[in-house]
Every structure is written in structure tokens, then in C-alpha cells.
Amino acid sequence: MGQKINPLGFRLGENQSHHSLWFAQPKSYCRGLQEDEKIRDCIKIYVQKNMRISSGFEGIAHIEIQKKMDLIQVIISIGFPNFLIEGGTRGIEELQMNVQKRFHSANRRLNIAITRVAKPYGQPNILAEYIARQLKNRVSFRKAMKKVIELTEQADTKGIQVQIAGRIDGKEIARVEWIREGRVPLQTIRAKIDHCSYTVRTIYGVLGIKIWIFVDEQ
């Protein structure tokens, strides 16, 4: 059987960069990873709760964490940051307070910055979240996958592959369904590939969503 490798880790240092930028001693490295996970989880939960009262679709492309001796800088890249930008600094301050409640550190300050993604439908995390919402609303998985491919045309991507695995449509036997449009050269290191894995809970069980996007070739 073919051996699969994560396309992001495969290209680190070539055309992909780390989303956590900090150094730590070997004994405290595990604690630093747990800190990052708590910060990311808290931000995602806050955005998901505010999605219900917001008219637009909110999607986090990625969260970058930079740690210094006295500062933790969090940069959130969001596709449609309506409730955070339209509310001025109030939305960002409220988010920062929520994160600080879970993250206690007397020696380091926490600073959160929001950046808008230029082409949100070229981000696999945002597209995976869109498919998850469609599946929860019992939309046909084929219709959801085709709609995602239509959305990526707005972002001028060179290729996309979408895969859904699990008990699709409530069938007794789990299976894998996928669709591809354009080129997705996973084995070419100079080809910049964005990838994400997303888990969604439906009434039939847990489904796994994977998306590969061919952005450009260097």
C-alpha cells in the first residue's frame, strides 16, 4: 500500500513555514505545545459561538503563535472577520479576555492581532468548515463538494482535491468519496500545496474531510 505523508510537513522550509514560532528547553517543550493547543482551541470556540449571531460565514485560515520572553503574539488569519472588525476593538478585546481566562501567565503579556485573508476560498480550512456545515444541514455530500470546487475558482487556484470518509449519508458500511479538479502534484516539492484535515460530527457518526489545494509552483 502507498505510504502517505503530510504535504505541509513534507514542504517545511521549502515553501511552507511553521505556525508556531518559539524556542524552549527540552523539559518545557511539551508544556509549550499544550499552551499553543489551548490558545488555538479557545480562539476557535469563541469564533464558532459568534458565528451564530453573525450574518456572514466566519472561517479561520490559520493561527500563528510567536513567543518571546515577555510577550505571546497571536496572529489570526480569518477569511470573513465581520464581527471582529465591524465591532472595532471591542471584538478583539473580548476575544483576548476569553483567551487570558484560560491561559494564566504573570510574566508574559498576550497580544492578539487579526488579519484578513485576501482570497478566503483558496484556504482549505475555510472550505472544510463550509463542507462540515453543509453535511450537518443534511445537504448531499456530492453537492457540497461540487460547490466547494466552484468557490475555489474565485481564488484562482491551479487544482483542488476533496475527500470525505466515513458513514456517508448514513450507510452501514463506511467508504471514501473524493473529487478532483485540475492538477494536485503531491510528490513535487516545489509545488506549494495547502492541506487540512477536518472532523465533523453528524447524526450518522463522525466524518473526516481532507482538502488539498495546489496554489502555485516555484
UniProtKB/Swiss-Prot annotation:
<dbReference type="Pfam" id="PF00189">
    <property type="entry name" value="Ribosomal_S3_C"/>
</dbReference>
<dbReference type="InterPro" id="IPR015946">
    <property type="entry name" value="KH_dom-like_a/b"/>
</dbReference>
<dbReference type="InterPro" id="IPR009019">
    <property type="entry name" value="KH_sf_prok-type"/>
</dbReference>
<dbReference type="GO" id="GO:0003735">
    <property type="term" value="F:structural constituent of ribosome"/>
</dbReference>
<keyword id="KW-0699">rRNA-binding</keyword>
<dbReference type="GO" id="GO:0019843">
    <property type="term" value="F:rRNA binding"/>
</dbReference>
<keyword id="KW-0689">Ribosomal protein</keyword>
<keyword id="KW-0934">Plastid</keyword>
<keyword id="KW-0694">RNA-binding</keyword>
<dbReference type="GO" id="GO:0006412">
    <property type="term" value="P:translation"/>
</dbReference>
<dbReference type="InterPro" id="IPR018280">
    <property type="entry name" value="Ribosomal_uS3_CS"/>
</dbReference>
<keyword id="KW-0150">Chloroplast</keyword>
<dbReference type="GO" id="GO:0009507">
    <property type="term" value="C:chloroplast"/>
</dbReference>
<protein>
    <recommendedName>
        <fullName>Small ribosomal subunit protein uS3c</fullName>
    </recommendedName>
</protein>
<dbReference type="InterPro" id="IPR036419">
    <property type="entry name" value="Ribosomal_S3_C_sf"/>
</dbReference>
<dbReference type="InterPro" id="IPR001351">
    <property type="entry name" value="Ribosomal_uS3_C"/>
</dbReference>
<keyword id="KW-0687">Ribonucleoprotein</keyword>
<comment type="subunit">
    <text>Part of the 30S ribosomal subunit.</text>
</comment>
<dbReference type="GO" id="GO:0022627">
    <property type="term" value="C:cytosolic small ribosomal subunit"/>
</dbReference>
<feature type="domain" description="KH type-2">
    <location>
        <begin position="47"/>
        <end position="118"/>
    </location>
</feature>
<dbReference type="InterPro" id="IPR005704">
    <property type="entry name" value="Ribosomal_uS3_bac-typ"/>
</dbReference>
<comment type="similarity">
    <text>Belongs to the universal ribosomal protein uS3 family.</text>
</comment>
